[in-house]
Curated annotation (Swiss-Prot):
Glycans are attached at residues 70, 85, 102, 175, 178, 243, 326, 395. This is Aspartic proteinase PCS1. Disruption phenotype: Embryonic lethality when homozygous. CDD domains: pepsin_A_like_plant. It comes from Arabidopsis thaliana (Mouse-ear cress). GO terms for molecular function: aspartic-type endopeptidase activity; peptidase activity. The gene is PCS1.
């Protein structure tokens, strides 16, 4: 989720209780040390399996924006001295990690971190270099509160937000003896697009390229994930190198960096260059200028594990929508309701009966390929359509095209969501400033890593 997003519908839970440490050439277990990740020469990686949980969609308050998010990745770990169990959303689009903080009389307040119970908790004063210089990438500048502590406010496009003080604390990772002292936000106020689900998550683990992100503070050279999209084996997150002999060679696309701040360009996001869109191998007639960020930074393309679907700027979305609609004419029946726009951004939907789904109708859909410099993501079959929960017309279910219109969100960017990254090995190579992509079967890869069924 890039820094303006917070996903809440389908929850992918990372279970840290089942740590696996594997070498680059085998899947055998071995002891794990986090310090080994400070160098790209490390031959060890940490693998965390994913779990899924379906979250109801009918609790969203009416005063929030129509757009809301659908998927979060969370990790369970312990923080403080003595350790307190917490769960954090893994967000590749956010920088500052934060915990929901609450000073409670309970010995272990549910889904809250109590700083008063930790002897290692250390608040950051607003006069510190951390507060004055390392928060410059925040959308809202850090400020000084009445206690002269560094105060941070984070906000998202779905009207969710969190605010509190920056602090340093010890984060414990599994059985590792190499615990790390990290800067994070101790948030006393958290407001989300689904209050019921907000209470189930302690905080957020920022994974973008900002100086205060978890990945930057820990010094990881690389991390990868593979999402299968199935309940039996949802996938995994891998921290460290992925030079496995059995892994399909990755195609790399460079990460884009700019030196001059621009109002609509997120400089710490994982930004790549979208060069075109293909339908069944044929490039759509889209002007190249529409795919390149303009002088304000609007139009960047971000790869985001925290956003479920893919969003395209209006002209590009319109071109793809029109072409896909023409190619599915005679195959699918359009859902004719001019007032219905799924999640406020997806307005191309279809009525499909269970019988037609079982007959394999989705395999007849045209393949949509997102073309980048040096790599592609091809989306075909089931991932092209998403079944709208609890909406039926007669015996038919309603399925919507899984590409949305960024303009309807008021967002000046392209976002490649994880729904279209299913069964792809996605590697974030921070040392060489690039993203690697390769189609794989995530369940098979998980088995090779010793975590699949």
């Amino acid at each position: 989720m890039f820094s303006r997003f917070h996903a809440l519908f389908l929850l992918l839970v990372l279970s840290v209780r089942t740590y696996k440490c594997v070498s680059s050439s085998s899947s055998s277990s071995s002891s794990f040390s986090f310090s080994s990740f400070s160098s790209s020469s490390s031959s060890q990686t940490l693998v965390l399996p994913l779990k899924t949980r379906i979250t109801p969609t009918d609790h969203r308050p009416t005063d929030k924006l129509h757009f809301h998010h659908n998927v979060t990745l969370t990790v369970t770990l312990t923080v403080g001295t003595p350790p307190q169990n917490i769960s954090m959303v893994i967000d590749t689009g956010s920088e500052l990690s934060w915990l929901r903080c609450n000073r409670s009389s309970n010995p272990n307040p549910v889904n809250n971190f109590d700083p008063t119970r930790s002897s290692s908790y250390s608040p950051i004063p607003c006069s510190s270099p951390t507060c004055r210089t390392r928060t410059r990438d925040f959308l809202i500048p850090a400020s000084c509160d009445s206690d002269k502590l560094c105060h941070a406010t984070l906000s998202y496009a779905d009207a969710s937000s969190s605010e509190g003080n920056l602090a340093a604390e010890i984060f414990h990772f599994g059985n590792s003896t190499n615990d790390s002292n990290l800067i994070f936000g101790c948030m006393g106020s958290v407001s989300g697009s689904d209050p019921e689900e907000d209470t189930k998550t302690t905080g957020l683990l920022g994974m973008n390229r900002g100086s205060l992100s978890f990945i930057s503070q820990m010094g990881f050279p690389k991390f990868s994930y593979c999402i299968s999209g199935t309940d039996d084996f949802p996938g995994f997150l891998l921290l460290g190198d992925s030079n496995f002999t059995w892994l399909t060679p990755l195609n790399y696309t460079p990460l884009i960096r700019i030196s001059t701040p621009l109002p609509y360009f997120d400089r710490v996001a994982y930004t790549v260059q979208l060069t075109g869109i293909k339908v069944n191998g044929k490039l759509l007639p889209i002007p190249k200028s529409v795919l390149v960020p303009d002088h304000t930074g609007a139009g960047q393309t971000m790869v985001d594990s925290g956003t479920q679907f893919t969003f395209l700027l209006g002209p590009v979305y319109t071109a793809l929508r029109s072409h896909f609609l023409n190619r599915t004419n005679g195959i699918l029946t359009v859902y004719e309701d001019p007032d219905f726009v799924f999640q406020g951004t997806m307005d191309l939907c279809y009525r499909i009966s269970p019988v037609r789904i079982r007959s394999g109708i989705l395999h007849r859909l045209p393949t949509v390929s997102l073309v980048f410099e040096g790599a592609e993501i091809a989306v075909s079959g089931q991932p092209l359509l998403y079944r709208v929960p609890h909406l039926t017309v007669g015996n038919d279910s309603v399925y919507c095209f899984t590409f949305g219109n960024s303009d309807l969100m008021g967002m000046e960017a392209y976002v490649i969501g994880h729904h279209h990254q299913q069964n792809m090995w996605i590697e974030f190579d921070l040392q060489r400033s690039r993203i690697g992509l390769a189609p794989v079967e995530c369940d098979v890869s998980g088995q090779r890593l010793g975590i699949g069924s």
